[in-house]
């Protein structure tokens, strides 16, 4: 809209303005100006019912401080602190570590089981799974579920086992998936029906076995506070609900990265840059984690790792 600029924003953050809404609500006020405004005024509603704020309750944010990839609507003090964190660190986490998505069956009531449950097919065709409720800050994450997993490693790739091989080597599994063929084919992947694919008996998202097997950091995708955990069980994890972080630099240990991710400074940064959802939960995307300002100090690494191990 030509010559129209946002003048004020009233942010309801995670307050339950609409029943069932998961994203937060804001009110934008626009006005027409012949020249661009220098500032936008922002107010965060502390509680409901909503009381119209006075002009003095709004904080002033310079338009020049707003970036194209996303607006950080914070006070000048918070914005300066975030900028200082970025300028003081030479790298971002992505240089040393990588985020990974997990496995998604598309039909948990058919393909997911309790960890100790006896499944109606060969147990060799399952893999343990870590769920969000298994993650606690600095703790070892333990799998509480297992899923049907018809995949094998081919070099560094994870490939779907041919249906004929499943029939020959895992007859109970073959019988089980054929029994549920109609249900499995009805699953959708990006709005496309799974039955249209040759690999209809696979998972919607299957992850990567080589990354599952590595020592890794796991965390729920939506949290109120950082609760990065360590997984040494070689388990898969639920895509969308849990993500993992692995070290991609042999000199930087997973324990060092874990200490960084669970630090108060890292939590402060994420809580001021990640998307906020209803109930006070922050959504940690791979982009949010990858772009964290990060510094590796080899002189302190051994002491940091020792502290993490002894927690």
Language-model segments: what does each one mean?
Residues 74-303:
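Polybasic, glycine- and aromatic-enriched phosphate-binding surface used to engage nucleic acids
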Residues 308-311:
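Short, intrinsically disordered, charge-balanced linker/junction segments flanking boundaries
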Residues 1-113, 239-242, 282-288:
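Signature of N6-adenine DNA methyltransferases within the class I
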């Amino acid at each position: 809209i030509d010559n129209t600029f946002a003048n004020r924003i009233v942010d309801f953050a995670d307050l339950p303005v609409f029943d069932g809404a998961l994203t937060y609500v804001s009110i934008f006020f626009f006005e027409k100006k012949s020249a661009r405004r220098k500032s936008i005024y922002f107010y965060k509603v502390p509680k409901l019912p909503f009381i119209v704020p006075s002009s003095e309750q709004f904080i002033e944010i310079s338009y020049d401080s707003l970036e194209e990839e996303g607006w950080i609507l914070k006070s000048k003090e918070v914005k300066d602190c975030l900028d200082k964190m970025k300028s003081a660190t030479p790298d971002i986490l992505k240089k040393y570590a990588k985020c990974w998505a997990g496995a998604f069956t598309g039909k948990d009531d058919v393909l997911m089981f309790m960890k100790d449950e006896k499944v109606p097919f060969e147990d060799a065709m399952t893999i343990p799974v870590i769920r969000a409720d298994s993650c606690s800050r600095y703790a070892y994450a333990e799998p509480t579920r297992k899923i049907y997993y018809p995949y094998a490693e081919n070099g560094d790739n994870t490939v779907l086992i041919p249906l004929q091989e499943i029939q020959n080597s895992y007859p109970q599994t073959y019988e089980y998936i054929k029994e549920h063929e109609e249900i499995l084919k009805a699953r959708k992947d990006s709005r496309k029906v799974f039955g249209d694919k040759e690999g209809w008996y696979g998972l919607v998202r299957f992850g990567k076995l080589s990354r599952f097997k590595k020592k890794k950091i796991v965390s729920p995708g939506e949290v109120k506070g950082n609760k990065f955990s360590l997984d040494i069980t070689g388990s898969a994890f639920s895509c969308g609900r849990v993500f993992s972080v692995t070290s991609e630099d042999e000199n930087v240990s997973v324990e060092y990265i874990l200490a960084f991710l669970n630090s108060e400074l890292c939590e402060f940064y994420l809580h001021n840059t990640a998307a906020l959802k209803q109930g006070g939960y922050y959504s940690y995307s791979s982009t949010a984690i990858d772009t964290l300002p990060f510094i590796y100090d080899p002189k302190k690494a051994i002491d940091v790792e020792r502290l993490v191990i002894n927690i």
